[in-house]
């Protein structure tokens, strides 16, 4: 099968009517962000949410857009867009005539509805206390809502929103989690409630369906509607949940439960025998099958995600992709229930694959690009896709043909010449084939300084995707040749390659980075091998601290964002203990300190010498900001040129527009200081 490249699709859709220029910080900050697509059952309409940046208010604003798929050449139109109001999470009614959505109009989150042809939106719910999201039953007579309420809450009633205030401002805890990602635990849990849906709305506070299960559904911090699914008849809800308790910070054991939508019976655990993660329950449109993914190993968050299938009549379970060495990242059934569309990383790309539910046969449907959402249709699918040189747009897959539906940022990107991306491979650690890419600034002549970017995870990838936080095209626009390596531990190359980083954080990955940079500077003569800065966040930030003590003479400067500085302190400061303990062999620090100390950057501070910019967020509970302050203290104490950026708003990620803009200015300014490249 021959694929039309994303670059070709982009070239077809976007003209360049004005003088060419490079991508800038302001461009990236102000781009429109399209996502959360929904398609009517008849394939007539596409609706999505689109974020615009309000830089003065330092936030994004979400509106709803629509596109008539039945008309060739139709243009996108705003469906709902009120000033200072966010409209998001669109869903169609079964007949395709109504769009349900979430809105914060009036200051309180509520579910609203609007005719797809337009008109005045109608508010459907009136409960107080906020909620996380919703799903309308296929039968159209119920709405499933998830919201943070006190454990055992019988309904969404405001009295169940928070516990009574303590005598003082202090918080008290008797077990972990005390905080998670960026939030201190307040005693509530994300729980599921069902409300009736009538022509007049969705009255009342609903009924709880979890019957005393204590845990978060969807899971925190990243879970959403993909972790809950209605049965086709609207009588059953399937959901993923990790039962809370003292082992919660040590456990990846989410299970799949089935619950009565009327709350009349206790939920049934459908996966009690698997102690790894089970997630993404997805019922087939014909109501006969339940698909989900399963990980085999307990405590390992990056294990292979195998597509599973349960016959809902007999209870028979089959592993559909047990022999496919890739991880299923998303699941969506075709309307006729004869195909399952999945996404899975594969060598720096994230394509769509089709899985036959009868045989388990896997067929790749798209080529290059990063697929971020898939909505099956009768003839194929509508999907969202981005790349290193293009933010998200929507495309139509019909059979094996891909056609572009939108050019959301055509005007904002007009006149900008994107860089050239070249993928390459080399022999890395263990004599394995390792992949990377190099990004060349458009129109560059002569040699350019290097931005050597190391990804996080560590089970992650520097793939062909757009990013707003670490944007390779923006670094190229600033005049840098960006090099990224998918070292051992990266995803998209089979499970053994990902597993190779366990108990090996500073070993094979560093060998790969050294070999990869050498391969890049040998292959691409436009890279200035003697003028390079290294930068990375999370595991990439750890690697920056490790490089300081192990490879310090190689770089003019280093940018370290939210990286581990002291593995011992990290073992007691982080919240998701399962991750830290798995990565160091499966034991807590006090049982096996040698495993943590072997690759501990703090042990090599005496060898540090490279100028470093340290960045951290005060709301980062994954790698707490004290790790960044400690690294900066070490640099200052040794007299090494260094700078510290502490963001009081940031968690492990920098999300606010002004903070993001500041981040880029600081990073490019620091790199420019040491490479001689003038910053924007």
What is each residue range found by the language model?
Residues 298, 408-530, 537, 570-572, ...:
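Cap/lid segment of the alpha/beta-hydrolase catalytic domain
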Residues 484-680:
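Active-site-proximal cap/loop segments of hydrolase catalytic domains
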Residues 50-63, 80-87, 100-112, 126-132, ...:
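A flexible loop/linker signature enriched in serine peptidases of the S9 family
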Residues 69-72, 115-119, 197-201, 260-264, ...:
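Short loop/turn segments that connect beta-strands within beta-propeller blades
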Residues 43-46, 96-99, 143-144, 237, ...:
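Hydrophobic beta-strand positions that form the internal "hydrophobic ladder"
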Residues 41-42, 94-95, 138-139, 232-233, ...:
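Residue-level detector of Asp-centered blade-edge/turn motifs that repeat once per structural unit
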Residues 38, 144-146, 169-174, 178-197, ...:
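Non-catalytic accessory segments flanking enzyme active sites
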């Amino acid at each position: 099968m021959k694929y039309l490249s994303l670059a070709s699709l982009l070239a077809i859709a976007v003209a360049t009517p004005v003088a060419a220029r490079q991508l800038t910080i302001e461009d990236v900050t102000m781009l429109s962000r399209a996502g959360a697509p929904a398609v009517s059952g008849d394939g007539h309409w596409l609706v999505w949410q689109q974020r615009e940046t309000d830089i003065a208010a330092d936030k994004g604003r979400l509106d709803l857009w629509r596109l008539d798929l039945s008309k060739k050449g139709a243009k996108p139109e705003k469906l709902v867009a009120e000033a200072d109001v966010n409209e998001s999470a669109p869903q169609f009614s079964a007949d395709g005539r109504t769009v349900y959505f979430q809105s914060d109009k009036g200051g309180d989150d509520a579910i609203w509805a609007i005719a797809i042809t337009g008109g005045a939106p109608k508010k459907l719910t009136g409960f107080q206390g906020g909620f996380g999201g919703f799903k309308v039953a296929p039968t159209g007579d119920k709405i499933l809502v998830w919201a943070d309420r006190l454990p055992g809450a019988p309904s969404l009633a405001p009295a169940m929103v928070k516990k009574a205030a303590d005598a003082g401002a202090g918080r008290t805890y008797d077990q972990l989690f005390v905080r998670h990602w960026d939030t201190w635990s307040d005693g509530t849990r994300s729980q599921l409630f069902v409300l009736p849906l009538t022509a007049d709305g969705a009255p009342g506070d609903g009924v709880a369906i979890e019957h005393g299960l204590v845990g978060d559904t969807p899971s925190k911090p990243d879970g959403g509607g993909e972790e809950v699914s209605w049965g086709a008849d609207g009588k059953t809800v399937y959901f993923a949940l990790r039962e809370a308790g003292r082992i919660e910070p040590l456990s990846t054991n989410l299970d799949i439960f089935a619950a009565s939508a009327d709350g009349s019976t206790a939920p049934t655990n459908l996966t009690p025998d698997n102690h790894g993660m089970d997630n993404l329950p997805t019922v087939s449109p014909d109501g006969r099958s339940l698909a989900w993914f399963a990980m085999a190993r307990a405590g390992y968050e990056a294990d292979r995600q195998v597509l599973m299938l349960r016959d809902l009549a007999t209870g028979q379970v089959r592993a559909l992709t047990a022999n496919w060495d890739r991880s299923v990242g998303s699941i969506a059934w075709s309307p006729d229930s004869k195909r399952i569309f999945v996404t899975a990383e594969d060598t720096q790309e994230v394509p769509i694959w089709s899985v036959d539910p009868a045989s388990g046969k896997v067929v790749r449907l798209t080529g290059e690009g990063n697929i971020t959402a898939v909505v099956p249709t009768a003839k194929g699918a509508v999907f969202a896709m981005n790349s290193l040189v293009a933010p998200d747009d929507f495309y139509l897959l019909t059979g094996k043909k891909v056609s572009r539906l939108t050019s959301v940022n055509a005007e904002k990107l007009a006149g900008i010449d994107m860089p050239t991306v070249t993928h390459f491979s080399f022999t890395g650690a263990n004599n394995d084939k390792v992949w990377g890419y190099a990004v060349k600034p458009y129109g560059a002549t002569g040699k350019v300084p290097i931005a050597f970017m190391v990804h996080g995870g560590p089970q992650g990838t520097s793939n062909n995707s757009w990013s707003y936080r670490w944007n390779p095209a923006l670094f190229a626009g600033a005049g840098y040749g960006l090099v990224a390596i998918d070292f051992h531990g990266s995803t998209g190359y089979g499970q053994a390659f990902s597993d190779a980083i366990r108990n090996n954080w500073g070993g094979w990955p560093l060998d790969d980075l050294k070999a990869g940079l050498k391969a890049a500077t040998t292959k691409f003569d436009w890279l200035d091998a003697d003028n390079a800065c290294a930068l990375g966040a999370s595991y990439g930030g750890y690697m920056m601290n490790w490089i300081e003590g192990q490879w310090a003479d190689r770089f003019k400067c280093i940018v370290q964002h939210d990286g581990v500085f002291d593995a011992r302190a990290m073992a007691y400061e982080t919240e998701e203990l399962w991750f830290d303990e798995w990565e160091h062999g499966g034991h807590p620090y006090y049982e096996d300190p040698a495993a943590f100390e072997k690759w501990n950057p703090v042990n090599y501070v005496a060898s540090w010498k490279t100028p470093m910019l340290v960045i951290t967020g005060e709301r980062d509970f994954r790698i707490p900001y004290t790790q960044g302050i400690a690294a900066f203290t070490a640099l200052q104490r040794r007299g090494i040129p260094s700078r510290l950026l502490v963001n009081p708003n940031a968690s492990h990620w920098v999300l606010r527009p002004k903070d993001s803009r500041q981040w880029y200015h600081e990073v490019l300014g620091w790199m420019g200081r040491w490479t001689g490249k003038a910053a924007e």
